[in-house]
């Protein structure tokens, strides 16, 4: 099973490393405009395989993506001093206009897994450029935000995070929506579980957890310049779900016909992920406040994509 990664920077290389550690693929091909960078990362990661799983890691060019079942797109440009978000979006859209056709020429049957930020808008750009069915252009979305939410809830409740079922939906960014109202632990509603555990969730606790999820990327970027290990592991997890036709539920971003009255927008909702990409979208139970917040998030994303002409 071959996986391609276009863009060998922090996120692309961390994803390749996670694929090796998790033993997800049998072959990983790194493609980057900076061929020396791709080659260096491929060689370095290959040397980890004796300690992990037998994965053939190599660098290549677009034609080497032939036969890939998943292509992870982590290509993009860094924000310049004084550059607006919309200007950055426009430059990244230009990058996608170059790379997406090249990917599909080599691997027309692949599922595209979008990692470039802002990921929701870039997922919509990739979908429009590709001409693929929307279910085959999947953004990493709020998988990391959802993981952070579950981890912080688990920490407060003194329970394993794997037993926490809670979602973050909408934008992967400032307008994301933490769905408190339908969160559960072990099949028990969150509030009831917290009371039974003697770990009540006060308004201050909720605010602390919300800030912990919503501001995590800012704290990490302030400390070391970028986030990559968490999203690299998350992208490897999504790749495994696709390659194994797992049909697991993940909060990934997808071009969606309508969300809370906002038409044609890419954002995150819980979705079933399998061999051909997204198989179904699940709408979690939301209270009125969460519904309004999701609508605002959708409007923000719709506006950004529309400003780019996508």
UniProtKB/Swiss-Prot annotation:
Do the record's keywords include Protease?
A: no
List of residues binding beta-D-fructose 1,6-bisphosphate: 150, 165
What is stated about the way this protein's activity is regulated?
Activated by citrate at pH 5. Allosterically activated by fructose 1,6-bisphosphate (FBP) at pH from 5.8 to 7.2.
Domain of life per record:
Bacteria
The answer, when asked if Cytoplasm is one of the entry's keywords, is yes
Describe the pH profile of activity.
Optimum pH is 5 and 6.7 with citrate and fructose 1,6-bisphosphate (FBP) as activator, respectively.
Q: Which UniProt keywords apply?
A: Allosteric enzyme, Cytoplasm, NAD, Oxidoreductase, Phosphoprotein
Pfam families named in the record: Ldh_1_C, Ldh_1_N
Q: What is its main location?
A: cytoplasm
Its pathway is: Fermentation; pyruvate fermentation to lactate; (S)-lactate from pyruvate: step 1/1
**Positions of the catalytic residues:** 172
Catalytic activity line of the entry: (S)-lactate + NAD(+) = pyruvate + NADH + H(+)
Provide the protein's localization: Cytoplasm
- GO terms for cellular component: cytoplasm
Quaternary structure note: Homotetramer.
| Name the record gives this protein | L-lactate dehydrogenase
Q: Which gene encodes it?
A: ldh
């Amino acid at each position: 099973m071959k996986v391609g990664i276009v863009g060998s920077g922090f996120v692309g290389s961390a994803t390749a490393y996670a694929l090796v550690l998790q033993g997800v693929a049998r072959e990983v091909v790194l493609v980057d405009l900076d061929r020396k960078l791709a080659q260096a990362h491929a060689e370095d990661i290959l040397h980890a395989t004796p300690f992990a799983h037998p994965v053939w890691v190599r660098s290549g060019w677009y034609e080497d993506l032939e036969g890939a079942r998943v292509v992870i797109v982590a290509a993009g440009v860094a924000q310049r001093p004084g550059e607006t978000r919309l200007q950055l979006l426009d430059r990244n859209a230009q990058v996608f206009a170059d790379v997406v056709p090249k990917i599909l020429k080599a691997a027309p049957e692949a599922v595209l897994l979008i990692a470039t930020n802002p990921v929701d808008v870039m997922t919509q750009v990739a979908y429009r450029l590709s001409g693929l069915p929307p279910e085959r252009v999947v953004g990493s979305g709020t998988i990391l935000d959802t993981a952070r939410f579950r981890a912080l809830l688990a920490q407060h409740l003194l329970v394993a995070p794997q037993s926490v079922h809670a979602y973050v939906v909408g934008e992967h960014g400032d307008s994301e929506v933490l769905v408190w109202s339908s969160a559960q632990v072990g099949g028990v509603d969150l509030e009831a579980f917290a009371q039974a555990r003697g770990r009540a969730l006060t308004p201050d606790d909720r605010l602390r957890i919300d800030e912990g999820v919503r501001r995590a990327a800012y704290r990490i970027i302030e400390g070391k310049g970028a986030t990559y290990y968490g999203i690299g592991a998350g992208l490897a997890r999504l790749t495994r779900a696709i390659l194994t036709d797992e049909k697991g539920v993940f909060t990934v971003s997808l071009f969606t016909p309508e969300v809370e009255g906002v038409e044609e927008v890419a954002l995150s909702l819980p979705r079933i992920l399998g061999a051909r990409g997204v198989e179904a979208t699940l709408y979690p139970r939301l209270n009125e406040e969460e519904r309004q917040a999701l609508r605002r998030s959708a409007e923000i994303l719709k506006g950004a994509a529309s400003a780019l002409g996508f």
